Regions:
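Function-determining sites in protein domains
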Residues: 1-247
């Protein structure tokens, strides 16, 4: 029902100076709200009754975040500020992406995962103990790295997947991946982006994880459970064997 929806659900699409934002139910802390950009009327539609609605809203900058990427919206009658994001944002370089989102201060690295084949079986690998400053240096030093224009036309040989947070804009456990052929890929801001940092840089990062971090391998077990003739109400999925391979 319409009256049970939040303002960000009712009035999700917001257009400001030709840029299309999509509001999400993530609060922007008052101390992160910058100067007011404009006041406007936002529109929403109840698809069940085909009724249309309008509401007043104020748009603000988010401190240290480019308005090309995101802004804050405050709806009339609502004291909270909400994130609204521009999914159509397309940076030209990795440096622009870093600066526009203040990634040095807003991006958090969580888990580092990979996969490898050993003795004919695929194994998932989890790395721990990575120095976050070293990771940043290895992956983000080339600020002139160009953004890929036609990402959908390329096939990437993925090497490492990094779980990242950008909580200021409402992202938790999002993917930032590194390919063996030298690309960084991410879906931050809701659309795929890729930057070419070069094969040498990618190999340097992979080598750092392999040689300087602790790695634990998990064997993928696709075997069928042995049939015993007895039914069970529990899960029949086979367990996953795990063992440490590097201290």
């Amino acid at each position: 029902r319409w009256d049970e929806k939040t303002n960000t659900e009712k009035f999700r699409e917001i257009t400001v100076n030709g840029k299309e934002y999509y509001a999400v139910n993530t609060y922007v802390a008052a101390d992160k709200v910058g100067k007011k950009v404009t006041k406007l009327t936002v529109l929403g539609k109840d698809v069940y009754t085909n009724s249309e609605y309008a509401a007043g809203a104020e748009i603000y900058e988010i401190k240290n975040i480019s308005s090309e990427c995101a802004a804050a919206v405050k709806y009339d009658g609502d004291e909270k500020y909400y994130v609204c994001r521009n999914a159509y944002y397309k940076p030209e370089t990795l440096g622009q992406f870093i600066n526009d989102l203040d990634l040095k201060n807003t991006l958090t690295f969580n888990e580092f995962n990979s996969a490898r084949e050993k003795n004919g079986k695929m194994r998932d690998v989890k790395y721990t103990g990575a120095d976050k400053e070293r990771v940043w240096e290895l992956l983000f030093s080339d600020t002139q790295a160009k953004a890929v224009k036609d990402i959908e036309t390329l096939n990437f040989e993925m090497a490492v997947d990094i779980s990242v947070d950008l909580k200021l804009l409402g992202y938790e456990n999002f993917s930032l991946s590194v390919s063996r052929d030298g690309y960084i890929l991410t879906n931050i801001l809701d659309t795929a982006k890729a930057f070419y940092i070069g094969r040498e840089a990618a190999e340097g990062f992979i080598s750092y994880l392999d040689n300087s971090c602790k790695a634990v391998e998990y064997e993928r077990d696709y075997s069928e459970p042995e049939y015993t003739g007895k039914e069970s109400s529990g899960s029949t999925a086979s367990g996953t064997a795990s063992y440490e391979v590097k201290q």
